[in-house]
Amino acid sequence: MENPRRVQILRAIVEDYVHSREPVGSKALVERHRLPVSSATVRNDMAALEEAGLIVAPHTSSGRIPTDRGYRVFVDQIAALQPLTGAQRRAIQVFLEGAHDLDDVMERTVRLLAQLTHQAAVIQYPVRAGITVRHVELVDVGAGTVLVILIPTSGRVAQRAVELAEPLDEVQLLELRARVLARVLGSTLETVPGRVAGLAEELPEALRHAGDRVSEALAVLAAASDEHRLVMAGTANLARFSGDFPQSISPVLEALEEQVTMLRLLSAMQQDERGVAVRIGSEECDDPLAEASVVATGYGPHAASKVGVVGPTRMDYPTTMAAVRAVARYLSRNLGD
């Protein structure tokens, strides 16, 4: 939009509506924002904004509210994000540094982001490119069952119980573990299935069945795709905004619960020069999140995984964008340590 005054008026309408949830009239705009023009001039500009599809009159109200297109213009006009306060930054750092493993980091991150933004927060587990095998442990749990434990450099421990035709004694178990480690230690997770293939044929007869079962378990554990997992927090926050979803909040909650929709959307979102991506309402597609907005950004190596929030289109975009970006940066730093 090239008209500076209309941009200013649109910005004021968005800010007032987000704050009050009440349609905004020309007189209120002039008084509240001390605009150096008359109410009649503002009404003319509002008529032009409405004709452009940026604001709309709900029902018979004399005031106007932003449309999805109006929010988009508003968001695109945000030149720089306001940094968080020193207290907020310290709180994020302390909160995340208290985590003891990857699962705890993920849980803490979404809880923190939900608290900061008062929206529903989501985080995608880190993509595993470059993650290698740190250790493999085999534990005899009795009754011919062995617990196969895979410990990758990402810190997320995975385990799987396998039943053996014959139990192994301690010496056999140690030998099998040594053979397995010789194959996979330091290997990337993607290569583990190929590295354990054929292992059983190289083992002594007494270990072949166990070697085959352990190899199968390791292949499954290594192939388990953490990047297709989401952690969520703050969905109860959406209930406070149920009136902001014209049809029903149910499709939004179902999309969050189903995860597939969220993962597909997050993977398609590309952050801009400000370091965030914003999807507003139905501007791109008609899906279960067509009445919601999503603010997300990448974190970790190459910003390949996403973290963000979901809320109504009537959202405090500048504050939300700044919070999402800040949390992602601290998260990247935490995981890189």
Swiss-Prot record:
Instruction: Give one GO molecular function term.
Output: DNA binding
- Entry's transmembrane regions: none
Reply yes or no: does the keyword Transcription regulation apply: yes
Reading the lineage from the top rank, the first entry is Bacteria
What functional role does this protein have? Negative regulator of class I heat shock genes (grpE-dnaK-dnaJ and groELS operons). Prevents heat-shock induction of these operons.
InterPro entries associated with the record: GAF-like_dom_sf (IPR029016), HrcA (IPR002571), HrcA_C (IPR021153), WH-like_DNA-bd_sf (IPR036388), WH_DNA-bd_sf (IPR036390), WHTH_transcript_rep_HrcA_IDD (IPR023120)
Q: Which gene encodes it?
A: hrcA
Query: Which organism is this protein's natural source?
Result: Kocuria rhizophila (strain ATCC 9341 / DSM 348 / NBRC 103217 / DC2201)
Annotated protein name in UniProt:
Heat-inducible transcription repressor HrcA
Output one GO BP term: negative regulation of DNA-templated transcription
Keywords, ordered alphabetically: Repressor, Stress response, Transcription, Transcription regulation
Give one Pfam family: HrcA
- What family classification does the UniProt entry report for this protein? Belongs to the HrcA family.
